[in-house]
Every structure is written in structure tokens, then in C-alpha cells.
Curated annotation (Swiss-Prot):
Protein name as catalogued: Non-structural protein 5
Required co-factors: Mg(2+)
Keywords from the UniProt entry: Glycoprotein, Host cytoplasm, Magnesium, Metal-binding, Nucleotide-binding, Phosphoprotein, RNA-binding
Highest taxon listed in the record's lineage: Viruses
Source species taxonomy: Viruses, Riboviria, Orthornavirae, Duplornaviricota, Resentoviricetes
């Protein structure tokens, strides 16, 4: 994957700030890294205080000040920059010559002259190999396999004694076979319970 961006053909940006008030003063901000001059409107503290004190607190609204606090409003107005339609701020040309008249000029002029080239190759291989043993389900684990118990004590040929029958009436009973099958099953269950214990 390759990405190439060329920004050399972008136009440069140029604009200016012009000050047309003779009462403006010039101050240099030494705290900033950009050593250039900025011009502010010189505040008239007496006129502002007189204006604010002449109005009752109920009459002071948002249109009079950005804040109802006179000190805050004074600070805001003292740092306000007067601009016109050709406004701009200089970031580069601090040593640019200013007009001969008493008009301040700040210039913003920069152009992007660097090309950005991004090249990245994505090459990856994913191999997954697993040996999964089939786990028995919980039902299979809970199920126990018991050994089969053979019961050979009873058989179909077994004949009841007269003492076990009512006067020998059950010797040839039609339920005899079903009785012995049920008896054998019950015996197997009993033997299995004994083994489990």
C-alpha cells in the first residue's frame, strides 16, 4: 500500500491588518514566542467608569458589556483588537517594514512546500493449528455405566410350590411368565443398588 500526498501546489495565504485610529498605541508581547508588535485600542478608563457608574445596575445589560463586572469588562475592552475588512494576523514576518504613515500592518504569509510520502507494506501470515479433544458432555459424565448382572436363579421352568400358591391354582397361570420377568428385573435392580452402596 502506497500513499503519496503533494501539497506544493497549494496557494499561499496572505492577508493584512490595518489600523486607522491615531489614538492607538503599540505594545510588544515579550511572553510569546512570536516576537511581533500588536496594536490594541487604548482604553479610556475614565470614560468607561463614568458610563458604567451613570447607569443603574438594573439598566446594565449584555449590550453594555461582555460582563456585568466593570473590572472584567475593562479588561476585555483593553485587549480588544480593532480590525477592518482587510483583517489578518502575522505569524511569520515580524521584521516586515511598516507603512510610513501611522498605520499598523501585520502580515500573514505562509505556504506549504513540503511533500508527504507515506509508504507501508502490509505482509502478514496467520496460521492456526489446534488439536481439540472432544470433551464429553456433562450428561455423558454424569451417566455411569454399570456392569451387567446376570441372574440365573430364576427361569421359565421354575414351578411354584404348593406353599406359594393358593391350593396350586397358579401352577399353570397365564401370568406366570410375566411374573418371573418382573421378578428378575426387580432382583437386578436390588443387586445393582447393593453394588453401588
Amino acid at each position: 500500500m502506497s500513499l503519496s500526498i503533494d501539497v506544493t501546489s497549494l496557494p499561499s495565504i496572505s492577508s493584512s491588518i490595518f489600523k486607522n485610529e491615531s489614538s492607538s498605541t503599540t505594545s510588544t508581547l515579550s511572553g510569546k514566542s512570536i516576537g511581533r508588535s500588536e496594536q490594541y485600542i487604548s482604553p479610556d478608563a475614565e470614560a468607561f467608569n463614568k458610563y458604567m457608574l451613570s447607569k443603574s445596575p438594573e439598566d446594565i445589560g449584555p449590550s453594555d458589556s461582555a460582563s456585568n463586572d466593570p473590572l472584567t469588562s475593562f479588561s476585555i475592552r483593553s485587549n480588544a483588537v480593532k480590525t477592518n475588512a482587510d483583517a489578518g494576523v502575522s505569524m511569520d514576518s515580524s521584521t516586515q517594514s511598516r507603512p510610513s504613515s501611522n498605520v499598523g500592518c501585520d502580515q500573514l504569509d505562509f505556504s506549504l512546500t513540503k511533500g508527504i510520502n507515506v509508504s507501508a507494506n502490509l505482509d502478514s501470515c496467520i496460521s492456526i493449528s489446534t488439536d481439540h479433544k472432544k470433551e464429553k458432555s456433562k450428561k455423558d459424565k454424569s451417566r455411569k455405566y454399570y456392569p451387567k448382572i446376570e441372574a440365573d436363579s430364576d427361569s421359565e421352568d421354575y414351578v411354584l410350590d404348593d406353599s406359594d400358591s393358593d391350593d396350586g391354582k397358579c401352577k399353570n397361570c397365564k401370568y406366570k411368565k410375566k411374573y418371573f420377568v418382573l421378578r428378575m428385573r426387580m432382583k437386578q435392580v436390588a443387586m445393582q443398588l447393593i453394588e453401588d452402596l
